[in-house]
Amino acid sequence: MDIVSRRIGRRSVLGGAAAVAAGSLVYPARGTFAASEQPVKIGMVDPQTGTFAAEGASEIIGAKLALDQINKAGGILGRPVELLIEDSASDPGLAVTKARKLVGSDKVNFLMGSVSSAVSLSLNQAADELKTLYVDTGGHTDQVTGTECRWTTFRTCSTTWMLTAGNFKTLFDKFGKNWYFLTPDYAYGHSLAKDYSKQLAKAGGKVLGNTLSPLGTTDFSSYLIKIREVKPDVMVNLTAGNDLVNSMKQAVQFGMEKEMTIAGAQIELEDLAAMPKEARLGWWVMEWYWDQPNQPHVADFVATYKTMAGGKPPSARSWFGFASLHAITMAANKAKALDTLSVVKAMEGLVLPPEIALQPNNPFYRAADHQMIANEFPGYVLSDGQYPNLFHVADIVPGTTIALSPAEDGCKMTYPT
């Protein structure tokens, strides 16, 4: 999977997603720096192929936008910043190999990236072994900042608990108490099903079944037939990426939306864009949304992003990449150092400024477990919407009101002596 590194000039950057087609890329520093200044290197391990390629592309473009801003503002400690990108293909083993290459051979100072929770868990462990700061941009399983929390890891996206708590009450109150889960068979899906089940039991509901589907499944017919026979009030579709697109298309082909409510936790703009109109339905949760007319700086961010993405608007994934790279930069400049422990300590409690937060309620990285506490954007899909107007945000739920405490999540952070 290793493809020889190549530099991306300005013209290819403006090609958006096409610029991330290769497996190993170097995005060079821009700005006015002395030729003798050695760049600060940040390695990004994200999927450019496979089930989550579209989500990975958005995270990468968001990070590139941040990189341009960072270097125009003076970089890190007055040095240019360089972004080195590797394709994880959503394979945990490959992701670790790429991370070790970035740290060992390319000498990156920091790591970031991930869409798959399985990859996040693997990079979480590898970063600890490498004693290198790692920001999990988009792998959600509770364990990353819960029972498997590490001093070297921070996370920008939500936990699965926050995703499920973002719309559980709405689904339960509106659509019924008997649920059936269609669950991707890896850490992300297991974590979502566990979190919804816990809330469902407490509310007096019932799990009628939980069918596991391997990541990368293309034919969901046998799973959907099984769910249809049980006749739940709600089919909770926990798949993601191409799996969500395929499962929703097939569920509608079976007419299941006429027999039960189809809903879920996280949904992404990339997935909605890939679905046919008839498959766009249900109540879900976004983690960030591009249309926030009353929120300062969002319109400017959207306009700038579109110039880098061939006219496409940013998604939550775009914001994950954007905010994560800015956060690393802010922490390093605050620490006035590049060693891992100093930057980690500077990042604990870090509050994103409005032009980076791009949402209300002052998102911050919680010191005790390194989890970003931002907002959830629950709502419903606009079946008759035209891209990118495909989702109605019904509410903005502050993360501070729904996040479990570090103790409840099982995080016991330890630091090197």
Q: Where are the regions a protein language model picked out?
A:
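Extracytosolic ligand-binding ectodomains
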Residues: D2-G9, L14-G16, G23-A29, F33-T417
